[in-house]
Structure formats: C-alpha cells, structure tokens
Amino acid sequence: MHYSSVLPDVIKVADEASEKVLHIYQSDFKVSYKSDDSPITAADTAAHDIITHGLRSISRDIPILSEEGKDIPWEERKHWRRFWLVDPVDGTKDFTQRTGEFTVNIAMIEDGLPVMGV
C-alpha cells in the first residue's frame, strides 16, 4: 500500500467524522457509561460508524480496531500484519465536560508500528 495515495481519502474520512462530532458537541447530548465506567456519547458511536464505513471503502481487506467497535480477541489480532487503529473521539471525558480537548484519531499500524496517522 502506498500511504500517500490513500492519505487524502483518510483525511476526508476524519473531516467527515469531525464535522459530526462537532455538531453533536454543540447539542444537548447524553452521556452513557461503558462496562469499564468510561463515558460514551452519540459522538463516539457516530464517528465510529463514519470512520469504519469510510476506511472499508478505502481498503476493505485491512482490519479495523476501534475503541467503539466489537471486541476482537488477541488470538485473532496477533496475526494482523497491518490494521487501522481508531479512537473515534479520543478524550470523551473532556468532550463531556466541554473543555474542547478531544480529537478524532485514525492510524495505520504495520508490523506493530504506526506508519500513518490522521
């Protein structure tokens, strides 16, 4: 994979997710809690959906590991040479407190190392 050839598409996906996150940020959103007591909002799930759909359209054969996705056992993941690592809203606690300190993160991991990040 030539990363420079997909980077503009990944940036577009991140921008689309970011727009949705900011729209929700400006609304009266609700906060729920996951089993580990970490917060989750509609922004997390909406960004996850946008990002996973976008990344699959870019590279259907590359697995996606997202904080808001299904749990994928290590026994399966340990064989992945390359995968997308996604945190749809990194800083959800700050998001819920409206500090402005949050981001959308998308990274390509190859052989255990980050090779591209948006």
What is each residue range found by the language model?
Residues M1-V89:
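N-terminal subdomain of lithium-sensitive/metallo-dependent phosphomonoesterases centered on the IMPase/IPPase/PAP
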Residues R77-V118:
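DPxDG-like acidic metal-binding loop motif
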